């Protein structure tokens, strides 16, 4: 499940540090979080969709690795992002 261009652009402008910023960890984590929430809603109605469940686990792992990287590089940015997205610290992978 992919995001449509309008939603993606809105997330990029909200979490980006400058115009056209698509590669910062904050933007990447925000995009992954949106895809994760969309897939979670999909799996609530389609319980036996195991291919999508595997995709969800892959996305969660990618987000966890990006959050670990951000926590290692800049703990203040990590804490601000976790607070903005409402992610649990244990799910974020850093203490």
Curated annotation (Swiss-Prot):
Annotated keywords: Ribonucleoprotein, Ribosomal protein, RNA-binding, rRNA-binding
PROSITE patterns: RIBOSOMAL_S15 (PS00362)
InterPro entries attached to this UniProt entry: Ribosomal_uS15, Ribosomal_uS15_bac-type, uS15_NS1_RNA-bd_sf
GO cellular component entries: cytosolic small ribosomal subunit
UniProt cross-references to Pfam families, sorted A to Z: Ribosomal_S15
GO molecular function annotation: rRNA binding; structural constituent of ribosome
Keyword Chloroplast: no
SMART domains: Ribosomal_S15
Keyword presence, rRNA-binding: yes
Highest taxon of the lineage: Bacteria
Gene Ontology biological process terms in this record: translation
Coiled-coil residues: none
Subunit structure: Part of the 30S ribosomal subunit. Forms a bridge to the 50S subunit in the 70S ribosome, contacting the 23S rRNA.
Recorded family membership: Belongs to the universal ribosomal protein uS15 family.
Function of the protein: One of the primary rRNA binding proteins, it binds directly to 16S rRNA where it helps nucleate assembly of the platform of the 30S subunit by binding and bridging several RNA helices of the 16S rRNA.
Listed name of the protein: Small ribosomal subunit protein uS15
């Amino acid at each position: 499940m992919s995001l449509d261009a309008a939603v993606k652009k809105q997330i990029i402008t909200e979490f980006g540090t400058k115009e056209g910023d698509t590669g910062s960890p904050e933007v990447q984590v925000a995009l992954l979080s949106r895809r994760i929430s969309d897939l979670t809603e999909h799996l609530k109605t389609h319980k036996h969709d195991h291919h999508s469940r595997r995709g969800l686990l892959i996305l969660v792992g990618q987000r966890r690795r990006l959050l670990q990287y951000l926590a290692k590089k800049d703990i203040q940015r990590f804490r601000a992002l976790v607070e903005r997205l409402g992610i649990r610290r244990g799910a974020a992978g850093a203490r």
